[in-house]
Amino acid sequence: MSIKSKEDLLNKQAEVNEQIKSYTCRVLVCSGTGCIASGAQKIYDEMSILCERIDGVTVEMQKDVPHVGVIKTGCQGLCELGPLMRIEPYDYQYVHVQPEDCKEIVERTILEGKPVERLFYRDNDTVCPHPDDIPFLNQQTRIVLENCGKIDAESIEEYIAVGGYQALAKVMGSMSPQEVIDEVTKSGLRGRGGAGFPAGKKWSQVARQAEKTRYVVCNGDEGDPGAFMDGSVMEGDPYKMIEGMTIAAYAVGAENGYIYVRAEYPLSVKRLRMAIEQAEKYGLLGDNILNSGVNFHLHINRGAGAFVCGEGSALTASIEGNRGMPRVKPPRTVEKGLWGKPTVLNNVETYANVPKIILQGADWFRTIGTEGSPGTKTFSLTGSIENTGLIEVPMGTTLRHIIYDIGGGLKSGAAFKGVQIGGPSGGCLILDQLDAPLDFDSVKKLDAIMGSGGLVVMDENTCMVEVARFFMNFTQRESCGKCVQCREGTKRMLEILERIVDGKGEMSDLDELEELANMVQNMALCGLGKSAPLPVISTLKRFRDEYEEHICDKKCRAKVCTALRQFHINPEFCIGCGKCAKNCPAGAISGKIKHPYHIDNDICIKCGACKDNCNFDAVYVEA
C-alpha cells in the first residue's frame, strides 16, 4: 500500500503497533556484523524453530495468531559480549547466548516469564537483568542509535511504528525547502565524518547554486581501523539515514542520491537495498513522494576499500567510475561535485540526526552537547578496555567518563597510557587530557581530530612508537600518490619509524620526523594527507621519552618491538618438558628432557612461539 499523506502514515503506524502489541513475547536477536560473527544466525535459527513448535506461535508477523516474534535487530551495543538477545516485554538482556541456551530460554522466559540468570550481564558482582541496569548502556544518550537493537533491521513497518518518516511527512506537508535548511542551520548540526563543517551551511550553499541539477551523497566509506559506527547504523536502522537523505534532497532540490558504501560492509549493502525497495513500495522514496510531486531516487555505490575515497572529491570521482583521487579545491563539492554538479555530501551519522531535528526542533537539539558542537556523537570503543562496543554520548563528554564509567576501565587493572582518537589520521591523548571535553573544537586544540569516532584505548603494554609506525604504515599504503608531499613524505616518515623500532635509529631522526610531519601537514593536497602525520606529531610531543629510549638505550619499555627484546628461560620454572624447543622455528632452544632449557639469542628470531607454548610461565621477555 502506498502512503500518500501524513494521515496514511499515522494509520500505518497504529496498525503495525497493534500487531506488535499482540505478541505475548518478542525475542530480539542482535544481528549486527559483530554478533553474526559470534554465531547470532544460529541463535536466530534455533529460536525460530523452537518458537514455531509452540502451539499457536508464529515467527512471522501475522494478524491472526501472533504470540511470539523472533526478530533480527541491529547492534545492541555490547559487541564483545555477543551473541546478544533481548526479551520483551520483560526487557531482559542476555549476553554470550549459545544455541544450547535457546531451549532453556523458551521454557523459562517465554513460557514462564522467568529469567535465565546465568545469561545476565555482570558488572563485577552486580547482576544486571535489564539494559538500564548496565553502566555501559544506561549512561548513553541515543539519538542516532535510538532504534538500533530495538526494531527489526529489515522491516520498514517497524521503523514506521516508532515514528519513522513522520519528519519527512512534516517537511513535505508544512515546510518549504528554505525552512528545512534554516532549521538544520539553527540546530548547529555539524558533519560527523571528520572536520565538523556545519551541515546547514553546506545545504544552503548547494541550494543557492544556479545549476538546477543537484545531488545528495552519503559517505558510508568508513575506512578507519577499529571504526564501525556508520556500518552499525546502516545495518541496524538504515531507514533513519535514508529519511534524512530524502529530507536533504527536498531542501536542496535534488532528484537523485547516492550512498557510497565499503564493499567490506556486505550486510550494510544488503539492508540498504531492502530499505530502499521497501521505501519505494510505500511511496516514501522514488516518484511523487507522499503525493507531494517531489521525486528522489536513491542508488547504492560499492567502494573498493580505498581509504582515500573517504575524502569528498575522491569519493565522487569513484562514483563516476574514475580512480578515487582528491582534486585541487576550489571549486568545492557544493559548487562542482558529482558529475560537476552541486552536491550535498555528508556521512551516515549526519543524515541520521536530521529526522529528529525536524521533529523535535533545533532548540531541542541544542540542549544536548556543547554550544559549538550540539547533539551527540557515536564512538566505537575498542582496545584494552573492559567493555568494548558501540556508544553514543553528548558532545562535550570527557574521555574519563567514556573510558572508566561507560567502558568499565582498563582490562586487568592495567595503567592507562593513551587513547587514539580519529583513527589513522587522528592523535594520541594522554592521562592529563582525560578530562578535556570531546567536541570538535576542543579535540582540535589537542593536536587531534574527532574523525568518524574511533576510540582505541591503550595501556602500559602498548609501545607508542609502534603505534605511530602502525598508523603511518596504514596511511602510507593508502596514499593515492597524487601529491609528492603525501606520497613521499609518508614514505620517508615510515622508513624512519621502522629504523627506530628496529633499534637502528639516531637522535637526528626525531628532528627529521618533525620536519617531515610539519611539511606534509601544511602542504598535502587533501584533508587526509594533511592529517596523516597527526599520530607522529602527537606521540612525539607526548611520548618523546619512548622514542629516545628506542634510540639511545635500544629499549622498548612495553616489550613490543621485536628487535629490541630478548627471550629467556627461567630455570626455576622450567620443568624440562621440551615443548618450547619443539615449537621453535629457528632451532634456537637447546636442552635435555627434565632439565632447564636455554635460548640462544644470536639465533632467536624473536617470534614468541616459545612463550606462547610454555604452560609454566618459564619463558620471559627482557627489553
Predicted regions and their residues:
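Iron-sulfur cluster-binding cysteine motifs and their immediate structural context
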Residues: 81-87, 485-491, 579-598, 609-623
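Ferredoxin-type iron-sulfur electron-transfer modules in oxidoreductases and energy-metabolism complexes
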Residues: 2-25, 41-70, 83, 88-121, ...
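Gly-rich Lys/Arg/Thr-decorated short loops/hinges at beta-loop-alpha junctions or inter-strand turns
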Residues: 150-166, 218-230, 333-338, 380-385, ...
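Short amphipathic, charge-patterned alpha-helical segments
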Residues: 244-246, 396-411
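Conserved phosphate/anionic-ligand binding catalytic regions in large, soluble enzymes, centered on
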Residues: 31-39, 80, 184-206, 305-317, ...
